[in-house]
Amino acid sequence: MEEIFKVGQIVNTHGIKGEVKVYPLTEDVNKFKKLKNVLIDGKERNIQSVKFQKDRVILKIEGIDTMNDAETYKQKYIEIFRSNAPKLEADTHYVVDLVGCMVYDSDNVELGKIFDVISTPSNDVYWIKEPKQLLIPVLKDIVLDINIDNKKIVIKPVRQWQDED
C-alpha cells in the first residue's frame, strides 16, 4: 500500500504573502481543514491557514512567505502520509489503493488491472483499460470482494450484469 498520498497540486500563487492556490485531488475539499502538515518534494511543512475559493484551496504554508517563494512551487504536488489521512468508513477504500488491483470474476477469469476510479453521482466506476476496456459499476451486487493487501478484486461475471449491445 502507498504510504504517501497526493491530495492536491499547486497551480498558482495567491496574493503577495506566499499563499498558494491548490487544485484538490480529493472529493471532499473540507478535509484540507483537518491537515496540520503536508509534504512538498518530500519535505514536511506546517499549514498555517486554509481558505477556499470556488473549486480551489488556498493554503498558507510555513516557509513560503512571498509571492516569489510561492512561484517556485507551481505545479508541485501536495502530499500527506497515510497516517495523517482521514479515517475511512467501513467498506470504503482510497483510490490510490484500488488502482493497480487485479480484477477477476467469480469464475476466476482475469479481467485486468484497475487503471482509475471514476466518480459518478450514483456510484463509483472501476476503469480497466487493458487487455479490453471495461467499466465496472461499484455496486454491492457486482463487486463481491476487495482484498487490498493482495491487490485483488472479485466481481460477478460480466455477462451477468452487463447489457449486450
Curated annotation (Swiss-Prot):
Pfam families: PRC, RimM
GO cellular component, one term: ribosome
Taxonomy, superkingdom: Bacteria
Domain PRC barrel: 89-161
Coiled-coil intervals, chain numbering: none
Domain notes: The PRC barrel domain binds ribosomal protein uS19.
Known role: An accessory protein needed during the final step in the assembly of 30S ribosomal subunit, possibly for assembly of the head region. Essential for efficient processing of 16S rRNA. May be needed both before and after RbfA during the maturation of 16S rRNA. It has affinity for free ribosomal 30S subunits but not for 70S ribosomes.
Protein's name according to its UniProt entry: Ribosome maturation factor RimM
Source organism: Clostridium botulinum (strain Eklund 17B / Type B)
Organism ancestry: Bacteria, Bacillati, Bacillota, Clostridia, Eubacteriales
Gene assigned in the entry: rimM
